[in-house]
Amino acid sequence: GFTHYHADHISGLPGLLLSMGNAERTEPLTMIGPKGLERVVGALRMIAPELPFEIRYIEIMEPEADIEINGYHIHAFRVNHNITCYGYTVEIRRAGRFSVEHAKEREIPQKYWNRLQKGEEIETEDGAHYTPDMVLGAARKGIKVTYCTDTRPTESLVASAKNSDLLICEGMYAEKEKIAKAKQYKHMTFYEAAEVAKKAEVAEMWLTHFSPSLVHAEDYMPQVREIFPNAFLGKDGKSVEPVSYTHLRAHETPEHL
Protein backbone atom coordinates (compact mmCIF):
# COMPACT_ATOMS: atom_id res chain seq x y z
CA GLY A 1 0.00 0.00 0.00
CA PHE A 2 1.17 3.51 -0.86
CA THR A 3 0.66 6.16 1.81
CA HIS A 4 1.18 9.07 -0.60
CA TYR A 5 3.08 10.03 -3.74
CA HIS A 6 6.16 11.92 -2.59
CA ALA A 7 9.28 10.67 -4.34
CA ASP A 8 10.94 9.19 -1.25
CA HIS A 9 7.97 6.83 -0.88
CA ILE A 10 7.51 5.64 -4.47
CA SER A 11 10.80 5.88 -6.38
CA GLY A 12 11.92 2.38 -5.36
CA LEU A 13 8.92 0.70 -6.98
CA PRO A 14 10.39 -0.10 -10.44
CA GLY A 15 13.31 -2.01 -8.94
CA LEU A 16 10.99 -3.94 -6.64
CA LEU A 17 8.73 -4.90 -9.54
CA LEU A 18 11.69 -6.05 -11.62
CA SER A 19 12.99 -8.12 -8.69
CA MET A 20 9.57 -9.79 -8.40
CA GLY A 21 9.61 -10.53 -12.11
CA ASN A 22 13.14 -11.94 -11.97
CA ALA A 23 11.99 -14.18 -9.10
CA GLU A 24 9.43 -15.64 -11.54
CA ARG A 25 6.37 -14.26 -9.81
CA THR A 26 3.26 -14.91 -11.88
CA GLU A 27 0.39 -14.33 -9.44
CA PRO A 28 -1.34 -10.92 -9.67
CA LEU A 29 -0.05 -8.08 -7.48
CA THR A 30 -2.60 -5.80 -5.81
CA MET A 31 -1.59 -2.21 -5.07
CA ILE A 32 -3.51 0.15 -2.80
CA GLY A 33 -3.11 3.91 -2.65
CA PRO A 34 -4.73 7.34 -2.83
CA LYS A 35 -6.48 8.61 -5.94
CA GLY A 36 -4.10 8.66 -8.92
CA LEU A 37 -2.43 5.34 -8.09
CA GLU A 38 -2.69 3.78 -11.56
CA ARG A 39 -1.40 6.95 -13.23
CA VAL A 40 1.58 7.23 -10.86
CA VAL A 41 2.53 3.56 -11.17
CA GLY A 42 2.11 3.73 -14.94
CA ALA A 43 4.63 6.56 -15.10
CA LEU A 44 7.12 4.70 -12.90
CA ARG A 45 6.77 1.59 -15.04
CA MET A 46 8.36 3.36 -18.00
CA ILE A 47 11.57 1.68 -16.81
CA ALA A 48 9.85 -1.62 -15.90
CA PRO A 49 7.35 -2.11 -18.74
CA GLU A 50 7.43 -5.90 -19.15
CA LEU A 51 6.36 -7.93 -16.14
CA PRO A 52 5.23 -11.58 -15.93
CA PHE A 53 2.34 -10.73 -13.61
CA GLU A 54 -0.77 -8.57 -13.63
CA ILE A 55 -1.02 -5.44 -11.47
CA ARG A 56 -4.39 -4.68 -9.92
CA TYR A 57 -5.20 -1.26 -8.49
CA ILE A 58 -7.38 -0.19 -5.58
CA GLU A 59 -7.62 3.61 -5.40
CA ILE A 60 -8.92 5.13 -2.17
CA MET A 61 -11.28 8.05 -2.66
CA GLU A 62 -12.83 8.46 0.80
CA PRO A 63 -11.35 9.45 4.20
CA GLU A 64 -11.52 5.78 5.22
CA ALA A 65 -11.73 2.46 3.38
CA ASP A 66 -11.88 -1.22 4.33
CA ILE A 67 -10.40 -3.85 2.02
CA GLU A 68 -10.20 -7.66 2.25
CA ILE A 69 -7.29 -9.37 0.46
CA ASN A 70 -6.26 -13.02 0.88
CA GLY A 71 -7.52 -13.22 4.45
CA TYR A 72 -6.09 -9.87 5.51
CA HIS A 73 -8.39 -7.04 6.60
CA ILE A 74 -6.89 -3.68 5.62
CA HIS A 75 -8.22 -0.40 6.98
CA ALA A 76 -7.00 2.78 5.27
CA PHE A 77 -7.43 6.10 7.07
CA ARG A 78 -6.63 9.67 6.07
CA VAL A 79 -3.89 11.46 8.02
CA ASN A 80 -2.60 15.04 8.03
CA HIS A 81 0.26 15.70 5.60
CA ASN A 82 0.76 18.44 3.00
CA ILE A 83 -0.68 16.19 0.27
CA THR A 84 -3.31 13.43 0.46
CA CYS A 85 -1.85 10.73 2.68
CA TYR A 86 -3.15 7.56 4.32
CA GLY A 87 -2.12 5.25 7.11
CA TYR A 88 -2.95 1.55 7.11
CA THR A 89 -4.00 -1.03 9.65
CA VAL A 90 -3.55 -4.68 8.67
CA GLU A 91 -5.38 -7.33 10.67
CA ILE A 92 -5.53 -11.10 10.68
CA ARG A 93 -8.90 -11.62 12.27
CA ARG A 94 -9.58 -14.72 14.30
CA ALA A 95 -12.95 -16.45 14.39
CA GLY A 96 -14.53 -17.69 17.58
CA ARG A 97 -14.14 -21.22 18.86
CA PHE A 98 -16.26 -23.98 17.37
CA SER A 99 -19.18 -24.88 19.66
CA VAL A 100 -20.38 -28.47 19.51
CA GLU A 101 -23.32 -27.44 21.69
CA HIS A 102 -24.44 -24.77 19.20
CA ALA A 103 -24.12 -27.19 16.31
CA LYS A 104 -26.19 -29.84 18.08
CA GLU A 105 -28.81 -27.35 19.26
CA ARG A 106 -29.34 -26.27 15.65
CA GLU A 107 -29.33 -29.89 14.47
CA ILE A 108 -26.53 -29.24 11.97
CA PRO A 109 -25.25 -32.51 10.47
CA GLN A 110 -21.74 -33.33 11.68
CA LYS A 111 -20.44 -33.72 8.11
CA TYR A 112 -20.75 -29.92 7.71
CA TRP A 113 -18.99 -28.92 10.93
CA ASN A 114 -15.46 -28.72 9.54
CA ARG A 115 -16.52 -26.58 6.58
CA LEU A 116 -18.46 -24.20 8.80
CA GLN A 117 -15.51 -23.91 11.19
CA LYS A 118 -13.38 -22.80 8.22
CA GLY A 119 -15.83 -19.99 7.44
CA GLU A 120 -17.76 -21.61 4.61
CA GLU A 121 -21.51 -21.10 4.14
CA ILE A 122 -23.47 -24.22 3.17
CA GLU A 123 -26.65 -24.62 1.14
CA THR A 124 -27.96 -28.20 1.14
CA GLU A 125 -29.98 -29.94 -1.54
CA ASP A 126 -33.06 -29.93 0.68
CA GLY A 127 -32.87 -26.13 1.09
CA ALA A 128 -31.21 -25.87 4.51
CA HIS A 129 -28.80 -22.94 4.91
CA TYR A 130 -25.97 -23.02 7.46
CA THR A 131 -23.57 -20.17 8.26
CA PRO A 132 -20.37 -20.09 10.39
CA ASP A 133 -21.92 -17.83 13.03
CA MET A 134 -24.35 -20.66 13.85
CA VAL A 135 -21.52 -22.79 15.26
CA LEU A 136 -18.83 -20.29 16.34
CA GLY A 137 -18.48 -18.30 19.54
CA ALA A 138 -17.39 -14.67 19.89
CA ALA A 139 -14.43 -13.55 17.77
CA ARG A 140 -11.02 -13.94 19.42
CA LYS A 141 -8.05 -11.60 19.30
CA GLY A 142 -5.99 -11.86 16.13
CA ILE A 143 -2.99 -9.81 14.98
CA LYS A 144 -3.13 -6.07 14.26
CA VAL A 145 -0.34 -3.92 12.82
CA THR A 146 -0.67 -0.19 12.06
CA TYR A 147 1.65 1.76 9.77
CA CYS A 148 1.72 5.51 9.27
CA THR A 149 4.24 7.99 7.98
CA ASP A 150 4.31 11.67 7.00
CA THR A 151 1.64 13.06 9.28
CA ARG A 152 0.90 15.21 12.27
CA PRO A 153 -0.79 13.45 15.21
CA THR A 154 -4.45 12.86 14.35
CA GLU A 155 -7.49 11.34 16.02
CA SER A 156 -7.89 9.05 13.01
CA LEU A 157 -4.44 7.61 13.70
CA VAL A 158 -5.12 7.06 17.40
CA ALA A 159 -8.50 5.47 16.71
CA SER A 160 -7.27 3.23 13.89
CA ALA A 161 -4.19 2.09 15.81
CA LYS A 162 -6.18 1.27 18.95
CA ASN A 163 -4.86 -1.89 20.64
CA SER A 164 -2.45 -2.73 17.80
CA ASP A 165 0.19 -5.34 18.47
CA LEU A 166 2.64 -3.10 16.62
CA LEU A 167 2.57 0.55 15.54
CA ILE A 168 5.17 1.54 12.94
CA CYS A 169 5.11 5.31 13.19
CA GLU A 170 6.97 8.21 11.70
CA GLY A 171 9.32 10.14 13.94
CA MET A 172 10.95 12.70 11.69
CA TYR A 173 12.54 14.79 14.42
CA ALA A 174 14.14 13.65 17.67
CA GLU A 175 15.10 17.12 18.90
CA LYS A 176 12.30 18.72 20.94
CA GLU A 177 13.22 22.18 19.67
CA LYS A 178 12.22 21.11 16.14
CA ILE A 179 8.52 20.96 16.99
CA ALA A 180 7.85 24.11 14.93
CA LYS A 181 9.52 22.49 11.92
CA ALA A 182 7.45 19.34 12.46
CA LYS A 183 4.26 21.39 12.39
CA GLN A 184 5.38 23.33 9.32
CA TYR A 185 6.20 20.26 7.23
CA LYS A 186 3.44 18.05 8.66
CA HIS A 187 5.61 15.52 10.46
CA MET A 188 5.97 14.31 14.06
CA THR A 189 8.64 14.39 16.70
CA PHE A 190 9.65 11.22 18.55
CA TYR A 191 7.69 12.46 21.56
CA GLU A 192 4.49 13.14 19.64
CA ALA A 193 4.67 9.64 18.18
CA ALA A 194 5.10 8.25 21.70
CA GLU A 195 1.97 10.12 22.82
CA VAL A 196 0.05 8.58 19.92
CA ALA A 197 1.23 5.10 20.93
CA LYS A 198 0.25 5.77 24.55
CA LYS A 199 -3.24 7.02 23.64
CA ALA A 200 -3.81 4.15 21.22
CA GLU A 201 -2.68 1.63 23.87
CA VAL A 202 -0.55 -0.31 21.41
CA ALA A 203 1.70 -3.13 22.57
CA GLU A 204 4.86 -1.90 20.84
CA MET A 205 5.97 1.04 18.66
CA TRP A 206 8.78 1.31 16.13
CA LEU A 207 9.88 4.78 15.07
CA THR A 208 10.82 5.31 11.44
CA HIS A 209 11.20 7.97 8.71
CA PHE A 210 14.02 9.87 10.43
CA SER A 211 15.36 13.19 9.24
CA PRO A 212 18.64 12.79 7.29
CA SER A 213 20.19 15.27 9.72
CA LEU A 214 19.49 13.02 12.71
CA VAL A 215 22.52 11.33 14.25
CA HIS A 216 22.68 9.11 17.36
CA ALA A 217 18.91 8.56 17.42
CA GLU A 218 19.25 6.10 20.30
CA ASP A 219 20.41 8.94 22.57
CA TYR A 220 16.86 10.33 22.54
CA MET A 221 15.07 7.07 23.34
CA PRO A 222 15.23 7.27 27.18
CA GLN A 223 13.08 10.43 27.03
CA VAL A 224 10.73 8.79 24.53
CA ARG A 225 10.34 5.76 26.81
CA GLU A 226 9.30 8.01 29.68
CA ILE A 227 6.15 8.60 27.61
CA PHE A 228 5.79 5.14 26.06
CA PRO A 229 8.12 2.48 27.51
CA ASN A 230 7.84 -0.06 24.70
CA ALA A 231 9.25 2.23 21.99
CA PHE A 232 12.10 1.23 19.68
CA LEU A 233 13.95 2.49 16.64
CA GLY A 234 12.96 0.78 13.41
CA LYS A 235 15.66 -0.48 11.08
CA ASP A 236 16.01 -2.63 7.96
CA GLY A 237 15.42 -6.29 8.69
CA LYS A 238 13.83 -5.71 12.10
CA SER A 239 11.14 -8.24 12.96
CA VAL A 240 8.95 -9.24 15.88
CA GLU A 241 6.55 -12.05 16.69
CA PRO A 242 3.46 -10.48 18.28
CA VAL A 243 2.17 -12.17 21.42
CA SER A 244 -1.12 -12.74 19.57
CA TYR A 245 0.67 -14.83 16.95
CA THR A 246 1.50 -17.57 19.42
CA HIS A 247 -2.23 -18.11 19.90
CA LEU A 248 -2.97 -18.51 16.19
CA ARG A 249 -2.98 -21.98 14.71
CA ALA A 250 -1.32 -22.44 11.35
CA HIS A 251 -4.61 -23.04 9.54
CA GLU A 252 -6.02 -19.79 10.90
CA THR A 253 -3.38 -17.58 9.27
CA PRO A 254 -3.97 -16.22 5.76
CA GLU A 255 -2.27 -17.58 2.69
CA HIS A 256 1.25 -16.22 2.03
CA LEU A 257 1.73 -15.05 5.67
Predicted regions and their residues:
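Charged helix-capping and loop-helix junction motifs
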Residues: 183-191
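Short, electropositive alpha-helical surface patch
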Residues: 217-237
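Active-site-proximal loop/helix segment associated with metal-binding centers of metalloenzymes
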Residues: 72-147, 151-160, 166-168
